[in-house]
């Protein structure tokens, strides 16, 4: 069930509320006419977006185009907007910086923010799922970058999200750790079945993981394409390379010069 995190459905006219409820059942995310301005400048400008339940969507775009702002709005962290945003009640977000509390053991970090008094076993289960059970009693400062990011993912997973929001979660990782983290996220998504919105600058990562790739420019979704490639994706597949090149061109990268 989705809710409008910015404007209660009860304030809408009955017909509008009924239509939104129907749309929510068919969508994990529904955004209509979203505008977000800073100092009179629209960073997001009358944006429309749908994400289907269980769909993995990657969002590309140059720095400053509004990607992270959109993700923060979907997460409910920024509500100074115009327009309508419908998202699931159960959602979670993981950022590039894991944001672990240094004075709490890893398993306690995983449980941060959960209502009630969840048992340690809840954290242990999530840590096992991300391959970090052996570090549950460690202090965050002793974790590697990849381990810290996995702890952040575990903290998101314990919320049993219907929507997982990922804001460049692999950006600070070295190449090998990044590949492992990408594989882990893909496996978690297939196992959990939740909708995922991944904000990234990495075109190859987007094609590798997503069902659909969006390109954001000047505050709107300027382009989108389905990734009609079998899983697991093969980066040596000519169709993979073609789609990567097409997306790079949409982002203003001269692929002919890149090849040269």
From Swiss-Prot:
Main location: membrane
Keyword Membrane assigned: yes
Database matches in InterPro entries: AAA+_ATPase, ABC_transporter-like_ATP-bd, ABC_transporter-like_CS, ABC_transporter_ATP-bind, P-loop_NTPase
A GO term, aspect molecular function: ATP binding
Top EC class for this record: translocase
Annotated EC: 7.6.2.14
Residue span, ABC transporter domain: 29-243
Catalytic activity reported: ATP + H2O + aliphatic sulfonate-[sulfonate-binding protein]Side 1 = ADP + phosphate + aliphatic sulfonateSide 2 + [sulfonate-binding protein]Side 1
Residues passing through the membrane, by range: none
Bilayer topology: Peripheral membrane protein
Subunit description: The complex is composed of two ATP-binding proteins (SsuB), two transmembrane proteins (SsuC) and a solute-binding protein (SsuA).
Purpose: Part of the ABC transporter complex SsuABC involved in aliphatic sulfonates import. Responsible for energy coupling to the transport system.
The family this protein is said to belong to: Belongs to the ABC transporter superfamily. Aliphatic sulfonates importer (TC 3.A.1.17.2) family.
Matching PANTHER family: ALIPHATIC SULFONATES IMPORT ATP-BINDING PROTEIN SSUB, TAURINE IMPORT ATP-BINDING PROTEIN-RELATED
Protein's recorded name: Aliphatic sulfonates import ATP-binding protein SsuB 1
Taxonomic placement: Bacteria, Bacillati, Actinomycetota, Actinomycetes, Kitasatosporales
Gene that this polypeptide is encoded by: ssuB1
């Amino acid at each position: 069930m989705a809710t409008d995190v910015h404007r209660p459905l009860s304030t809408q006219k009955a017909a509008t509320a009924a239509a939104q409820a129907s749309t929510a059942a068919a969508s994990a995310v529904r955004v209509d006419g979203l505008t977000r301005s800073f100092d009179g400048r629209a960073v997001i400008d009358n944006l429309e977006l749908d994400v289907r339940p269980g769909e993995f969507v990657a969002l590309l775009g140059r720095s400053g185009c509004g990607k992270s702002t959109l993700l923060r709005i979907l997460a409910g962290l920024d509500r100074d907007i115009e327009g309508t945003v419908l998202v699931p009640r159960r959602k979670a977000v993981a950022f590039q910086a894991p944001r672990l509390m240094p004075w709490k053991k890893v398993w306690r970090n995983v449980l941060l923010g959960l209502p009630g008094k969840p048992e340690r076993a809840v954290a242990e289960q999530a840590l096992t799922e991300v391959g970090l059970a052996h570090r549950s009693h460690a202090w965050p400062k002793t974790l590697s970058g990849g381990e810290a990011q996995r702890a952040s993912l575990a903290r998101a997973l314990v919320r049993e999200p219907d929507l997982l929001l990922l804001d460049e979660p692999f950006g600070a990782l070295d190449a090998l750790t990044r590949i492992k983290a990408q594989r882990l996220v893909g496996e978690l998504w297939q196992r959990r079945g939740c909708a995922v919105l991944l904000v990234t600058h990495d075109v190859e990562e987007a094609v590798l993981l997503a069902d659909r790739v969006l390109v954001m420019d000047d505050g709107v979704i300027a382009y989108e394409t389905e990734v009609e490639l079998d899983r697991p994706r093969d980066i040596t597949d000519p169709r993979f390379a073609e789609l990567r090149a097409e997306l790079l061109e949409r982002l203003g990268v001269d692929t002919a010069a890149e090849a040269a």
